[in-house]
């Protein structure tokens, strides 16, 4: 795990302007240059505690970091363990120190996947083993459950390994569904299905593993179409608007818009699983890709041997109000970019 790198802070230059050649996205052209550094020793867990893989991360309205961990549970290739994880799976962390402020979710989830925190501080979670989508209060009280526990399906009452949730200002929400299905569903705030779209394939509005969903300020729905190696854009009615595709973008696992007032304002950050074998650090070329609104690749960081202190394999990401970037994957990391 590269112990020599754990004792140092690695850095990389990140350019926040479109580049002439997207394949060379790590090389500067003109404009302001940022340096991204992973914060060593973050997060800070209690003695004897371990994260395991962290599948989701978000920043809540109070500025705390909320993480969804698997706590040692492994996703085997041929089956999913349906036994609830005994340890707390949702951790609320101090953004500065990385200390755990509170933890909940013990005995409730079998294979954590997506995590979103809405403007009211509610926590939305998906479990790909249980085929369910949940809404919790900030303190862990369950407010809404969608899907039949452990039962996959394609109708309005079932999911097949749902991967993520995006919540609109009006309280309605979108679900990416997922590993078994190839669709996006739009629900009213009370859980009524409003519409859905998508099927399997590589054409516009078709998907090969819908791995995440996000909403843009202009009213567009952004979908991480992982195995088609692209991000698709739709209007709120599900009509195809366009796509992001580039030699510099591999498999998009998740994406988040840059908050106003941060260096990332107006840009998108994409958790890129790279190409080749996701579990082969030497081949995957995984990292975080910075994308302009028009789809131009601006930069990339969080790469092993460049600015990540240990293997990371980004699976999800979030941006704090101060511009700090939190990357979840094999572990949880914090990057400061200035």
Question: Where are the predicted features?
Answer:
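Enrichment for repetitive, rod-forming helical segments
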Residues: 13-14, 233
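Eukaryotic scaffold repeat domains enriched in small/polar residues
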Residues: 27-338
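Bacterial N-terminal signal peptides that target proteins for export
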Residues: 1-12, 20-21
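Sec/Tat signal peptide C-region and signal peptidase I cleavage site
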Residues: 22-26
């Amino acid at each position: 795990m590269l112990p020599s790198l754990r004792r140092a802070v690695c850095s990389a230059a990140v350019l926040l302007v479109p580049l002439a050649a997207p394949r060379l996205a790590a090389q500067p052209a003109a404009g302001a240059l940022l340096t991204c550094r992973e914060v060593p020793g973050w997060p800070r867990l209690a003695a004897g505690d371990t994260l395991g893989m962290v599948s989701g991360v978000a920043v809540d309205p109070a500025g705390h970091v909320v993480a969804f961990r698997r706590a040692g549970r492994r996703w085997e290739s041929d089956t999913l363990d349906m036994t609830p994880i005994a340890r707390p799976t949702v951790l609320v962390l101090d953004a500065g120190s990385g200390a755990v402020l509170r933890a909940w979710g013990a005995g409730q989830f079998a294979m954590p996947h997506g995590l979103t925190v809405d403007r009211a501080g509610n926590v939305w979670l998906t479990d790909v083993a249980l085929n369910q989508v949940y809404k919790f209060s900030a303190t862990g009280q369950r407010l809404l459950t969608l899907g039949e526990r452990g039962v996959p399906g394609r109708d309005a009452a079932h999911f097949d390994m749902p991967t993520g949730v995006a919540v609109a200002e009006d309280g309605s929400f979108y679900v990416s569904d997922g590993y078994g299905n190839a669709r996006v569903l739009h629900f009213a705030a009370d859980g009524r299905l409003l519409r859905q779209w998508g099927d399997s394939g590589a054409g516009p509005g078709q998907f090969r593993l819908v791995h995440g969903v996000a909403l843009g300020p202009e009213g567009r729905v952004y979908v991480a179409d992982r195995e088609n190696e692209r991000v698709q854009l739709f209007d709120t009615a599900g009509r195809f608007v366009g796509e992001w595709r580039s030699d510099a973008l591999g498999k998009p696992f998740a994406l988040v818009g840059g908050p106003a007032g941060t260096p990332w304002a107006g840009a998108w950050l994409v958790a890129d699983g790279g190409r080749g074998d996701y579990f082969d650090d030497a081949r995957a070329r995984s990292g975080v890709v910075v994308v302009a609104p028009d789809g131009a690749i601006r930069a990339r960081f969080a790469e092993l041997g460049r600015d990540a202190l240990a293997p990371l394999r980004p699976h999800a990401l979030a941006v704090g109000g101060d511009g700090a970037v939190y990357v979840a994957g094999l572990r949880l990391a914090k990057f400061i970019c200035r």
